[in-house]
Regions:
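Polyanion-binding interface signature
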Residues: 1-83
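Exposed alpha-helical structural elements
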Residues: 49-53, 92, 103
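Accessory terminal regions of nucleic-acid processing enzymes
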Residues: 72-95, 102, 110-113
Length: 113
């Protein structure tokens, strides 16, 4: 993970045109909100979307933006830069992300996306 960037993702590709992504994004005025989400893109020209049953599996919140399914992580909402640095340095944040990826992956590996 490149901590100098606002966003990082893991892509599962069937082919060049069909991709399912698990992503993490820091947002907010000072990038103090961390969100995780999933999205499915079936064409380079199409609007990213997530199948309804995928959204139901991962989150109870749906929006119409770039990440139709996402979750704010309460523990990491409005955290201070110093707290963020500590979570990164201790490895707690990367462990949380690894657990989240495993959680998502376990639920998508048998789905026909």
């Amino acid at each position: 993970i490149d901590w100098t960037k606002q966003y990082t993702k893991i892509s599962f590709r069937k082919n060049e045109w069909d991709t399912f992504e698990i992503g993490f994004n820091f947002e907010g005025k000072n990038l103090t909100h961390l969100i995780s989400g999933v999205r499915h893109i079936d064409s380079l020209n199409s609007k990213p979307d997530v199948h309804k049953h995928i959204v139901e599996i991962f989150t109870d919140h749906k929006q119409s933006g770039w990440w139709p399914a996402y979750q704010y992580i309460p523990k990491y909402k409005n955290w201070l830069a110093l707290e963020m640095q500590e979570y990164i340095e201790t490895g707690e944040l990367i462990r949380w992300m690894e657990n989240k990826v495993n959680y998502y992956y376990d639920r998508i590996e048998n789905l026909n996306l």
